[in-house]
Amino acid sequence: MLARDFESELLGCRIEATAIGPFAIGRLRSRDAIQLVEAAVQKRQNLDIAICNAHTLLSAMDDPRYAATLQKMTLLNDGIGMSLASKLLREEPFPENLNGTDLIPRILANIGIPLRIYLLGAKEEQVRLAKEHIETAYPKHQVVGYRDGYFASDELDSLCQGINETKPDLLLVAMGNPRQETFIVENRSALAVPVAIGVGALFDFMSGAVVRAPKIFQAAGLEWLFRLLQEPRRLFRRYVIGIPRFLFALMKIRFSRSGVSR
């Protein structure tokens, strides 16, 4: 194996992970993630999840503070870039693509316990519609509170207090990275919620504000290309410049003595 692999135990579940640079990415399937979330809720133990794509890791490689934040979380893989990284460094892909747009609905549909859910992020209209979608599609769960992701730093104390007053089991934070992961980690001691997950644009998809890529793009791992075609100016730097940079970073890891285990 070219990459360092790890095994550890989290909430009574055996977790295998592969190192991509300084980041240990869990080699999980959806059912494993569901088991983790359920165990954390039942045991009232903290579980903070960051769903990482190539852009996430590249951003963290450029920002030591963000890197330190991610290293305090349970990291899951998202997208073809991460699959490529695993193939290059471990000689096999991750067992499943755990992008949040698919993973969160699978958790809500298949978890064995009812959840009290708080939604934080996106615009007011989008998060409200996401609440309605969850309540309609997954009626065994209760959305106990929600608010948009536009708040000032001096509102953090009251925001965390308001979240805690709803007694949630699951906090979904949709503010993009690095902001959503930074919020979770920096406010963890003030939050009385066992599970917190950064979910990116999930509320935009749930509300219908953003159209998801057609199935053919999803199956081919090319959702990023569809998004680039829809928003070329906003996403040009992320994909057209970011993808080659990520590939170069992977090659450095592969051939670096500090990143290779033989």
Language-model regions: role of each:
Residues 163, 167-173, 177, 193:
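Proline-aspartate-enriched helix->loop->beta-strand connector
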